[in-house]
Regions:
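Short, glycine-rich, amphipathic interfacial segments at transmembrane boundaries or analogous
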Residues: 3-10, 67-116, 175-194
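A hydrophobic, helix-centered structural microdomain
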Residues: 22-92, 210-225
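Hydrophobic structural segments characteristic of membrane proteins
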Residues: 1-16, 65, 133-225
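Juxtamembrane loop-helix boundary motifs flanking transmembrane segments in multi-pass membrane proteins
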Residues: 14-29, 113, 117, 152
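Short phosphate-engaging motifs
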Residues: 51, 95, 117, 132, ...
Length: 225
């Protein structure tokens, strides 16, 4: 996306007159207890698989560690460190500038198919979404929740319009409405933001449970299980 296109995108403000944010302290308490208990159980169960995956990543590319740590923007704009299994080469961030012209997403988001920076084991981890599992530690620490808008990069948030920043009203999550959309990379940035605003207005325990089950179904279907 060119600078001119990005500036044009930023100046087009969607109609959010129907958006309404309501604090839900009881739901937030239930959500935090659920996140804390389930993430702890997952950490215990996945401890050995985490070690095995880490070793495989190191064998595939020894130039960097198995865990990728990056700044992300959380609730109310607070910055936190997100954890993921490393799926790209050690100098992936340095190569980003030369790949920007191939960006397949609109808005302040970068995604391309067949990214040349992805390692062999990284392709497998991404195809199964296993690379996202270390975010369970973020959930346990309270940086994230199982359900909520996906956490954005600080440089992306800097380009947000006021309507886009509404997604920062709640704790970011591991999955969301956008995450379970078929061919989600074909979803426009504005549609993505609208899905996040929809979740913020409608959020409740039943929606969270449905999204968690939909995510598991989506992953199993995607992997052919």
């Amino acid at each position: 996306m060119t600078l001119e296109q990005l500036q044009e995108h930023k100046n087009i403000e969607p109609d959010i007159s129907s958006f309404e944010y309501r604090p839900k302290p009881v739901f937030d308490l239930f959500k935090r207890l659920f996140d804390l208990v389930v993430s702890f159980v997952c950490i215990v169960i996945l401890a050995i698989p985490f070690v095995i995956i880490s070793v495989l990543i190191m064998i595939d590319d020894r130039k960097a560690g198995p865990i990728f740590v990056q700044d992300r923007v959380g609730k109310n704009g607070k910055i936190f460190k997100i954890y993921k299994f490393r799926t790209m080469c050690a100098n992936a961030e340095e190569k980003l500038a030369e790949l920007q012209k191939f960006n397949e997403m609109d808005g302040p988001v970068f995604k391309i198919g067949n990214d040349p920076r992805i390692t062999k084991i990284g392709k497998l981890l991404r195809a199964s979404n296993i690379d996202e599992l270390p975010q369970i530690f973020n959930i346990f620490l309270g940086h994230m929740s199982f359900v909520g808008p996906r956490p954005a990069l600080p440089k992306e948030v800097e380009q947000y319009r006021p309507s886009d920043k509404l997604r920062l009203l709640v704790i970011p999550g591991l999955t969301c409405y956008w995450q379970v959309v078929k061919n989600r990379n074909s979803v426009s940035f504005d549609e993505w933001m609208e899905l996040d605003r929809k979740y913020i207005m409608e959020r409740n325990a039943w929606i969270d449970i449905k999204l968690i089950f939909k995510t598991f179904f989506f992953l199993f279907k995607k992997s052919g299980c």
